[in-house]
Regions:
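A cytosolic small-molecule/anion-sensing beta-strand core signal
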Residues: 61-62, 77-78, 198-199, 214-215, ...
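Conserved short histidine dyad/triad with adjacent acidic residue
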Residues: 35-51, 172-188
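Short acidic-glycine-tyrosine-enriched beta hairpin
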Residues: 10, 71-86, 208-224
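Ligand-binding loop in jelly-roll beta-barrel domains
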Residues: 30, 86-113, 167, 223-248
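A short, N-terminal "cap"/entry segment at the start of jelly-roll beta-barrel domains
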Residues: 1-33, 41, 117-170
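Glycine- and acidic-residue-biased ligand/ion/polar-headgroup-sensing regions
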Residues: 53-65, 190-202, 207
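Histidine-centered metal-chelating micro-motifs
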Residues: 45, 66, 80-82, 86-92, ...
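Fold-core signature of tandem repeat domains
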Residues: 37, 58, 103-105, 174, ...
């Protein structure tokens, strides 16, 4: 999926590059890739493995996933985020009884989307992933439950919760209402800023246009792309910065 470096992206629920009945690619860039995955109760995910050069992250939208985190195992219900730093052994599956839907984020992409294309076609493809026979090592994935995280509560209708802060990727959940003025049009030179609307509607300012986006919409602003947003009612979204580029630190200072 080739993108003009200066053009923002807006994809509504179900839109994107569909690889099969489960996987829809939302963004593929060197800095980050995002795909939305919808699996049934019989889904068996990858066994224990690690990545040397990128962060592998997840946000559970519906259902639950079971994660291997080092030698530990945990259940991640809807609203849980997981960010796995390089060299941490991890794996995941759907424990059932129902289906699950989640976002999978790789920062940088490290050829993950190209790997998926080959895997769907039944072809081998070498990328930054290394299988291990048994889980080992520390449980150092950053796991944050639905009501957890570093909450930055503002007096004007905004709560910004830091879910993960690493050099390569930071994750936030913003909850707000129309009392908050939102964010004026701006751009970043050093990272990709993207959003997934979890609930409600938001007016996004993308380039010279304003678009109303609802639940399940994904928006990405590559470096140089002008973007901003205006709340119109209670809403929440996942905000993703890749790389972090100091954004989490600046959020604390606001």
């Amino acid at each position: 999926m080739e993108l003009d470096v200066a053009q923002p992206v807006l994809l509504r629920h179900g839109e994107g590059e569909r690889l099969n009945e489960r996987i829809v690619v939302k963004l593929e860039r060197p800095e980050i890739s995002v795909n939305e995955v919808d699996v049934g109760p019989d889904f068996v995910g990858p066994g224990p493995h690690f990545h040397k050069n990128h962060v592998d992250a997840f946000y559970v939208l519906e259902g639950q996933l079971e994660f291997t985190n080092g030698t530990e195992t945990l259940l991640a219900p809807a609203g849980t985020s997981v960010a796995v730093p390089p060299n941490i052994v991890h794996g995941f599956t759907n424990p059932g009884p129902g289906g699950a839907r989640y976002l999978n984020i790789h920062a940088p992409d490290a050829d993950f989307i190209e790997y998926l294309r080959h895997a769907v076609a039944g072809e081998e493809f070498s990328w930054d992933s290394y299988d291990v026979d048994e889980p080992y090592g520390p449980a150092e994935a950053i796991v944050v439950g639905p009501d957890d995280g570093e909450r930055l509560v503002r007096p004007f209708g905004l709560t910004n919760t830091i879910r993960a802060e690493t050099t390569l990727l930071s994750l936030f959940v913003l909850e707000f209402d129309e009392r908050w003025e939102g964010v004026d049009p701006h751009h970043h030179d050093d990272h990709v800023d993207s959003f997934f609307i979890l609930d409600g509607e938001v007016d996004f300012l993308l380039g010279d246009e304003t678009t109303r986006a609802g639940t399940g919409t994904y928006v990405a602003a590559p470096p140089g792309a002008t973007h901003g947003f205006r709340p119109i009612a209670p809403a929440s979204f996942l905000n993703i910065h890749a790389p972090d580029a100091g954004f989490a630190g600046r959020a604390r200072g606001r």
